[in-house]
Amino acid sequence: MKRIVVLGAGESGSGAAILAKEKGFDVFVSDCGTISDPYRALLDQNGVSWEDGKHSEELILNADEVVKSPGIPLTAPLIQKLQAQGTPIISEIEFASRYTNAKMICITGSNGKTTTTSLIFYILKQAGLNVGLAGNIGNSLALQVAHEDHDYYVIELSSFQLDNMYDFKADVAILLNITPDHLDRYDYKFQNYVDAKFRITRNQTKEDSFIYWAEDPVIDREMKRLQLGATLYPYGFTVPNPLPVSEEELALKGRHNVLNSMAATIAANVVGIKKEVIRESLKTFQGVEHRLQYVATVRGVRWINDSKATNVNSCWYALESMTTPTVLILGGKDKGNDYSEIDELVNEKCHTLVFMGLHNEKLREHFGKLVESQKSKVERPIQIIDTNNLHDAVQAAYHAAKEGDTVLLSPCCASFDLFKSYEDRGEQFMEAVRKL
């Protein structure tokens, strides 16, 4: 009996273990953290052996194949040992795709993935298709394949998931944009990250579709260099507009969301969804939690939760959509960020910056210089307030904001210094705002 070891027992790892067990493999799950109670119960119910708090090498190195959580870097010593002995290491998506004939609509990019994935899923649901939502959102693809296989899957893919995909093929692949992100995981080499993103086109043929933003300079450069097998569908403001509604009628506001809506429209067209269904869906889609999410108005100040902005480019889009004077809360685990990308918008839109994190040194250094350069030019330079937790950050923003202002949480950084996830950060922020 072939032995499958699953490293990491979160949503994707637990799902992969259940599917592997169902397919008759000898399965073992190992997580160096603590496996949460719901996943422990799921593994126990399905008779899957597991351990947590450690990786027992004698139970792992004898695997015929390893399914790795996307959160474990390829540089981890255990992964290096497995690679050195030639053990195949794959992602949960790669594993699950072997056991379904469903059409795969896959979305990647540095920003806009969750919004675009959710919008495409919504359009397909409105059209009455039997469709599942998987990848970074929704339930694990493997668990859905095991328990309730669908005809279509709309899958949000990070670069980490794409790293360990080899034979998987997207019927429809969408690449939204590429800006520097996660460089700490790619030896601080931007091209390594770019190459990971383009893995979404791997194994595609003329029967498959590749939808991409034509005006993204990095994508444009790569498209001139690469010979891709798929049928190409570029979109943007300089190519024919695929939208069946005017920009004003779109439920999602902001220039970046016009682009996301274009990508979703082309995907729906490729799948064969009727134009009237697409039109209605674009007008009625509700958006995504923690992405420019309105929280409350307190004493005339609007509070916006954009906790999903885990990189500088996401924050750029958030600031671009601000129409009133802004207090920006930012900070967290830095991933090799270049904050100069938002200097112009910070100058234009913000009167106060509130840093929230355990390591604000890089923020202080960068934006301190920006404020110094302002002093000779403007009457009131930007105010900087340094905090090391969310409660103090919200209180500082509350006292700095005036009636008619907006307080925007758009951290530019990962959440793992103070929070479990960006969702946890967003939930705690909204709770703190509602208590004001």
Go through the PLM ranges and name each one.
Residues 26-33, 210-214, 329-330, 349-358:
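Short internal beta-strands
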Residues 84, 227-231, 239-243, 368-383:
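Short, basic, low-complexity termini and linkers enriched in Ser/Thr/Gly/Pro
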Residues 11, 73, 111-115, 258, ...:
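Residue-level detector of alpha-helix initiation sites
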Residues 21-22, 57-63, 70-214, 218-230, ...:
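Phosphate-binding loop of NTP-binding sites
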Residues 20, 66, 107, 136, ...:
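Residue-level signal for inorganic ion chemistry
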Residues 39-41, 340-404:
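C-terminal helical cap/extension that packs against the catalytic core
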Residues 3, 15-23, 250-351:
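Nucleotide phosphate-binding/pyrophosphate-handling subdomain across enzymes
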Residues 1-91, 95, 253, 365:
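N-terminal leader/targeting and accessory segments in enzymes
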